[in-house]
Amino acid sequence: MWDFSTEPEFQQKLDWMKQFVRDEVEPMDLVFNRPGHNFDVTDKRALAAVRPLQEEVRRQGLWACHLTPELGGQGYGQVQLALMNEILGATKWGPRVFGCQAPDSGNAEILAKFGTAEQKARYLAPLLEGEIVSCFSMTEPQGGSDPRVFETKAVRDGDEWVIDGYKWFSSQARWASFLILMAVTDAKAPVGERFSMFLIPGDTP
């Protein structure tokens, strides 16, 4: 049997999270996610309500805990993150308030590890601050998230790449300042080596 008990200091953080989410975050769902109102991460009224909550989370040392300390997080392990996400999953706005909203969380890690200095300055820094949102574009209609049947291709044309294909279920695409898109660049390579990730500005035609 799995043992999900944790050290007293971290349990105190979990207890604080439960109370904070119940008292401060869950009410946002009643205001901004009521029937007939779509979840909109660019809603100015919602953002005005979220900002002070995010600042309190930062003061508690619980902002973006999946990230390493160099990126402003705590570098927590999977069990600790699972216990936190169990609490945050009770509300739509919880992950946004705590800086761990997908796909921003994963995109931040990709940029931190593989991004250029220019990309980090333009996209990673504001993403970590919660000033912009991003999109991860992988799923295709003919195969879902099974990369073995992906058809979207990227072909180099001089100094540029031409991407041709169709994606759907690209979370946050309508609001994203940038997308990270998965495309085939070497169709003859083994499945795990035939793809590349492309960072695409959100205003690209």
Protein language model features and the residues they cover:
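N-terminal glycine-rich flavin-associated loop
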Residues: 98-118, 144
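A structural signal for short hydrophobic beta-strand segments in well-ordered beta-sheet cores
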Residues: 154-155
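Amphipathic, small/basic residue-rich leader segments at the start of a protein or domain
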Residues: 1-102, 118-129
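A short core secondary-structure module
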Residues: 160, 164-205
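Short, solvent-exposed loop/turn elements at beta->coil junctions and helix N-caps
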Residues: 70, 139-143, 168-169
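Active-site-adjacent elements of ketosynthase-type condensing enzymes
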Residues: 141-151
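Conserved protein kinase catalytic domain
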Residues: 85, 108-111, 124, 180, ...
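A short, Trp-centered hydrophobic/proline-enriched beta-strand micro-motif
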Residues: 130-138, 182
